[in-house]
């Protein structure tokens, strides 16, 4: 799609979009590596930087030597540990009336910190790298299906899968927010300063066990490590897909390293660049939030570009967006633009 759009629109637009995604993803990779390093530090008495370095090497080895698709289907089960937040939310009995009321009518303030978190929340929901990863993975799955003699996935099937996946993802995010807010506030913790602080949100789930705090840390660490093993290759891979599109290189995680050296070289460089950010001693929690804010800001021009591309029959053929899709895309663009602008003004006036 990028290559096709570059034939219609200015290549400056193409390179600008790719540049934004590369910057955002490298920052995200660095933040994710730092988060996993902190999670490993909860389990083993090793320095965070050493843990981050070992983890980075493991990720690259698995992605290149084993193949992402070969191990990702097993690692998905590690992500089930995030269900602990759903169960914990039920255990702690929050005031559900207040929760639902706050979801519908949030208490808005004009402080910079408030809008910083709002833009970060948008950045974790409208993840720019997924524009590249999702589209390319669908193409790769179609190729795999053709090789195996399986029926091709229809657009209706793809749309249904995306709807189900995004619904589950967002429900999981909501429960994580509810659980963390309720449990940490009950314990007088107003700010998360470390991975250990974040892990305390799961203590009610294991409070009947001896050393409940230790079990909470283990649960939290398993979830973070699993998501890191799944997410970092996606971030690095989407960088490589984006750059490969501009260079018309052979691309795809179904190829071996010897078959797509340039594609994998970009993955290695993007992952290494993210790891280098850890050398300067970034705080894992602050880095994750900052990376999400960058995602939120980068998503503004990308959403508008998707709106333009999806409405252009020269790019989409007969599959242009319908009225509902166009309306939702335009609304998303306006909301993200407004939140980004308010954040900018609030930071300047602070």
Where do the protein language model's features map onto the residues?
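Extracellular/periplasmic helix-exit of transmembrane alpha-helices
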Residues: 136, 140-143, 167-197
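Loop-to-transmembrane helix boundary motifs in multi-pass membrane proteins
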Residues: 11-12, 49-53, 164, 168, ...
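Hydrophobic alpha-helical segments and their helix-loop junctions in multi-pass secondary transporters
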Residues: 80-107, 123-138, 305-314, 339-350
């Amino acid at each position: 799609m990028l290559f096709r759009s570059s034939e219609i629109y200015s290549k400056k637009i193409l390179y600008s979009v790719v540049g934004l995604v590369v910057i955002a993803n490298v920052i995200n990779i660095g933040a994710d590596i730092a988060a996993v390093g902190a999670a490993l530090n909860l389990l083993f008495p090793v320095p965070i930087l050493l843990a981050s370095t070992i983890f980075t090497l493991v990720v690259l080895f698995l992605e290149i030597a084993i193949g992402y698709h070969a191990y990702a289907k097993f690692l998905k089960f590690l992500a089930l540990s995030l269900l602990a937040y759903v169960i914990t939310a039920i255990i702690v009995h929050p005031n559900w009336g207040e929760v639902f009321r706050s979801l519908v009518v949030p208490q808005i303030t004009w402080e910079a910190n408030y809008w910083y978190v709002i833009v970060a929340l948008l950045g974790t929901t409208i993840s720019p790298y997924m524009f590249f990863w999702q589209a390319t993975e669908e193409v790769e799955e179609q190729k795999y299906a053709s090789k195996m003699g399986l029926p091709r996935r229809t657009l209706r099937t793809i749309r249904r899968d995306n709807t189900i996946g995004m619904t589950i993802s967002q429900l999981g995010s909501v429960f994580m927010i509810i659980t963390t807010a309720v449990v940490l506030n009950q314990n007088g913790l107003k700010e998360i300063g470390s991975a250990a602080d974040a892990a305390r949100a799961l203590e009610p789930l294991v409070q009947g066990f001896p050393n409940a705090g230790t079990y909470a840390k283990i649960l939290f660490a398993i979830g973070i490590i699993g998501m890191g093993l799944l997410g970092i290759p996606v971030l690095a891979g989407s960088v490589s897909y984006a750059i490969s599109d501009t260079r018309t290189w052979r691309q795809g995680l179904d190829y071996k390293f010897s078959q797509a050296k340039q594609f994998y070289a970009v993955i290695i460089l993007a992952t290494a660049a993210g790891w280098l950010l850890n050398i300067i001693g970034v705080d894992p929690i602050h880095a994750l939030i900052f990376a999400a804010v960058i995602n939120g800001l980068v998503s503004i021009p990308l959403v508008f570009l998707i709106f333009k591309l999806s409405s252009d029959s020269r790019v989409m053929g007969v599959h242009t967006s319908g009225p509902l899709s166009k309306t939702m895309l335009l609304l998303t663009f306006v909301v993200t633009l407004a939140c980004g602008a308010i954040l900018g003004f609030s930071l300047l006036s602070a």
